[in-house]
């Protein structure tokens, strides 16, 4: 699968702490290999928009859609508790 970053996602990622960025890139490698990789905890977030959520860390999540052979990254933010 190919990874596509939205412009907004790139900006949001740059604003996250460096430790979160490092964890994100590690998780992204897992996503590229297998969406069911255990540490991702990937799940459908919104059925109507085909939006998925995956774990970066305990406190951070990223959001993406699956379009053909692409994962399109849309958002990264703190996980609400």
Give the ranges of each region predicted by the language model.
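A periodicity- and composition-biased signal for non-globular, repetitive helical segments
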Residues: 8, 27, 33, 49-50, ...
């Amino acid at each position: 699968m190919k990874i596509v970053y939205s412009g907004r996602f790139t900006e949001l990622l740059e604003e996250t702490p460096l430790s979160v960025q490092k964890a994100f890139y590690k998780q992204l490698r897992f996503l590229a290999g297998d969406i069911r990789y255990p540490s991702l905890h990937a799940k459908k977030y919104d059925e109507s928009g085909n939006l998925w959520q995956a774990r970066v860390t305990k406190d951070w999540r990223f959001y993406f859609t699956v379009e053909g052979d692409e994962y399109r990254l849309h958002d990264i933010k703190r996980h609400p508790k």
